[in-house]
Every structure is written in C-alpha cells, then in structure tokens.
C-alpha cells in the first residue's frame, strides 16, 4: 500500500486482520486527517470497523491504528501510550513522516 502526504509517498503494509481488510476495500481513499496532540492525524468514519483492541505501551512513528472501532489514526512520532488500538498496518520507513505531516490538518491518500 502507498500513503501519500503532501506529495511524499510512503510504502506501507497492512495487517492480516478484518479491520485492515475493510480499509483495503475502500482503496483508493483520500481523506482529510485532523491533527491531534502533536503526534498523530486521525479521521473518523461514519461506520464501524471490526476491531480486536490491545494496549500499546509504545506507539511508533508510522503506525496506522484503529481507535474506538471507527477512527483511523496515523502516528508520525514515537511515544509511550496506555491506549488500546487495533493495528491496521504501518509505514515501512517513516523517515520524513513528521515533516510531511506538518502541524495542522492534512489531506492523505491511501492507494493499493
């Protein structure tokens, strides 16, 4: 999968689970993601995804996770966390991701 942010393309892999398969069915997909906490961008769908949440002690830059069964979150910084998510996938090489993500809301394109 490719994740395109501001003209920069990142290679990513999806997990082998029901939530990631549902996301893959929506590709190609272009969404406006909202900035949160200086470390993530999120988009809330109007539908629920299958979820199998587990607690993440550390979130890594490039993690693509599902929160609360309907919110896709792309993390662009690594930090400690106590929240639970379902893993959707990850960017293979997140170098340059913080710069591409910037400080505000962004348009993100997901492609096969």
What is the predicted function of each stretch?
Residues 1-42:
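N-terminal secretory signal peptides
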Residues 37-58:
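Compact, glycine-rich, soluble single-domain proteins
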Residues 75-91:
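Short, compositionally biased
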Residues 2-5, 25-28, 52, 105-112:
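N-terminal non-globular leader segments, chiefly Sec-dependent signal peptides
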Residues 89-112:
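Well-ordered alpha/beta subsegment
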């Amino acid at each position: 999968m490719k994740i395109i942010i501001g003209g920069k393309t990142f290679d990513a892999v999806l997990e082998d689970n029901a939530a990631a398969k549902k996301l893959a069915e929506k590709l190609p997909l272009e969404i406006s993601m909202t900035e949160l906490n200086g470390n993530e961008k999120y988009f809330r769908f109007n539908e629920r995804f299958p979820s199998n949440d587990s607690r993440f002690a550390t979130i890594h830059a490039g993690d693509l996770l599902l929160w609360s069964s309907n919110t896709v979150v792309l993390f662009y910084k690594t930090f400690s966390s106590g929240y639970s998510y379902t893993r959707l996938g990850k960017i293979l090489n997140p170098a340059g991701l913080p710069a591409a993500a910037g400080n505000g809301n962004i348009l993100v394109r997901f492609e096969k």
